[in-house]
């Protein structure tokens, strides 16, 4: 079943080789299988992982040529013959991870991103930097009519990644969490989700992002580049160390520092992806202080629903910058320069 006026071709942003030119081209509109939806993409968030993919950091897992993007939101325009629970006109979200098996121990326990059978939009299959995309009905996320669709798009990866990583810290209301890279796209989500969850936030980033972080709700701000002995400073600021740390910064030093200023029995969660992520570990300190170290990547269907609900209810308000599909290369450069302080979203109605 299809709505009217679906074109044969569409605009898509493609690269032929890692680090190569990013070009908007005309490609065929995909046809959905019997258990798939065809979604007209209205918005697609631009994630730091898209930059990593284009640069070849995920070459071991990605395909090339590739249409990137994995934070899509739009409207269902075609449904396959065996699709259940969806109608034409429904609003749908497309998240990074799809095609998980639903039968392994990870899928059955709510840890779908760890399934060995997953595929990733914008990495090993064409993603959301195109006007139309197919997705299995069970992988699509329902987005209510009460939700701002442009705001929902970046939640499908960036927002849920920040939200789930904060849950992983086990920081309780009233306790302190430190967020490194707090002024970037993930950190901007992180500050607001942390506040909504009752945490007290120490934001760590370049001094130019202090006002931005404080406006989002950070109680304290620490200059990541010019603070003498940042470890001692944060330990003093937090009266003995943070209860939890989420390292959004895509650099090794913040990860190393986090292990030093987290308090005894605290939890450090690594999210940011530095190019060379190998760091030294003081195992004696980890053992004697009972420090927990975790990695965290995106979230389950339930995590996504919960993260979007904060947006729908107006509790989380992360600034969004709307751009054209042709602007993605310049956004990547700004990401590399550390000059992104909001979630940047492609608006497909902009030409």
UniProtKB/Swiss-Prot annotation:
The keyword Oxidoreductase applies. It is an enzyme of class 1 (oxidoreductase). The keyword Acetylation does not apply. GO terms for cellular component: cytoplasm. Zn(2+) 2 binds at residues 101, 104, 107, 115. Pfam families: ADH_N (PF08240), ADH_zinc_N (PF00107). It catalyses: a primary alcohol + NAD(+) = an aldehyde + NADH + H(+); a secondary alcohol + NAD(+) = a ketone + NADH + H(+). Its cofactor is Zn(2+). GO terms for molecular function: alcohol dehydrogenase (NAD+) activity; zinc ion binding. Keywords: Metal-binding, NAD, Oxidoreductase, Zinc. Its EC number is 1.1.1.1. Zn(2+) 1 binds at residues 47, 70, 157. Binds 2 Zn(2+) ions per subunit. NAD(+) binds at residues 181-187, 205, 209, 271-273, 343. Homotetramer. Belongs to the zinc-containing alcohol dehydrogenase family. This is Alcohol dehydrogenase 2.
């Amino acid at each position: 079943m299809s709505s009217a006026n679906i074109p044969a071709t569409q605009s898509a942003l493609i690269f032929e080789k890692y680090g190569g030119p990013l070009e908007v081209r005309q490609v065929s509109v995909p046809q959905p299988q019997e258990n798939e939806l065809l979604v007209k993409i209205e918005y697609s968030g631009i994630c730091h992982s898209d930059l990593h993919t284009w640069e070849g950091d995920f070459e071991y897992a990605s395909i090339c040529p590739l249409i990137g993007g994995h934070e899509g939101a739009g409207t269902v325009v075609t449904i396959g013959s065996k699709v259940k629970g969806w109608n034409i006109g429904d609003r749908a979200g497309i998240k990074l991870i799809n095609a998980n098996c639903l039968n392994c121990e990870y899928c059955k326990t709510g840890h779908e991103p760890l399934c060995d059978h997953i595929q990733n939009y914008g990495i090993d299959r064409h993603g959301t930097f195109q006007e139309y995309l197919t997705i299995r009905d069970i992988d699509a996320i329902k987005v209510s009519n009460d939700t701002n669709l442009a705001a929902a798009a970046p939640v499908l990866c960036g927002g849920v990644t920040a939200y789930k990583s904060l849950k992983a810290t086990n920081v309780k209301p009233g306790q302190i969490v430190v967020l490194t890279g707090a002024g970037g796209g993930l950190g901007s989500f992180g500050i607001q989700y942390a506040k909504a969850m009752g945490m007290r936030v120490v934001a760590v980033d370049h001094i130019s992002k202090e006002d931005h972080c404080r406006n989002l709700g950070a109680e304290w701000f620490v200059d990541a580049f010019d603070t003498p002995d940042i470890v001692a400073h944060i330990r003093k600021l937090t009266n003995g160390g943070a209860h939890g740390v989420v390292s959004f910064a895509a650099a090794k030093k913040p990860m190393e520092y986090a292990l030093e200023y987290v308090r005894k029995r605290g939890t450090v969660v690594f999210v940011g992806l530095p190019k060379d992520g190998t760091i030294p570990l003081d195992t004696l300190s980890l053992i004697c202080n009972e420090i927990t170290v975790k990695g965290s990547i995106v979230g389950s269907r339930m995590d996504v629903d919960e993260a979007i609900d904060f947006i729908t209810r107006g509790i989380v308000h992360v600034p969004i910058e709307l751009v054209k599909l042709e602007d993605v290369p310049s956004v990547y450069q700004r990401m590399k320069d550390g000059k992104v302080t909001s979630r940047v979203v492609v608006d497909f109605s902009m030409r």
